A protein has these predicted regions:
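Electrostatic, structured charged patches in enzyme active sites and in nucleic-acid/phosphate-binding
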Residues: 1-131
């Protein structure tokens, strides 16, 4: 059985904060009810546990990790709620869950030039063609 941690508790616990070995993902595999396979992978560079919610995420993580230009990989990274609500409003679409729910991206990667790249890993059959 999954145990969901409230967004308020996650903020108190500083989940979704930190960098490198000190990063704690915003969503843990123990609180996620997946139709697929969740994985906890030990990162061989930082020693930190990486929480992947699907086989696709695990495969993408390995591709990211083998690229030496990726200096930090943070999974289940929380997005700024004010920005996601604004984007939904501008596009005329309903913000997922309630408007106070924190959304995440599957991976936020810091490159060696300090640029940030966000990745969402989805199976193509789960994509919605209406947007």
């Amino acid at each position: 059985m999954t145990r969901r941690i409230s967004d308020k508790s996650k903020q108190i616990l500083h989940m979704g904060e930190g960098k490198g070995k000190d990063y704690v993902p915003y969503i843990l595999t123990s609180e996620f009810n997946s139709l697929g396979t969740t994985s906890i992978i030990t990162d061989w560079k930082t020693g930190r546990n990486i929480h992947c919610m699907s086989q696709g995420e695990a495969m993408w993580y390995f591709l990211l990790r083998w690229d030496d230009s990726n200096i930090d990989i943070r999974e289940q990274f929380p997005l700024d709620n004010k920005i996601t609500v604004k984007i939904a409003d501008e596009l005329g679409i309903k913000h997922p869950q309630d408007r106070n729910h924190i959304m995440t991206t599957d991976f936020l990667v810091t490159k060696s030039d300090n640029s940030l790249h966000a990745y969402s890993v989805k199976v193509d059959k789960n994509l919605n063609n209406q947007i």
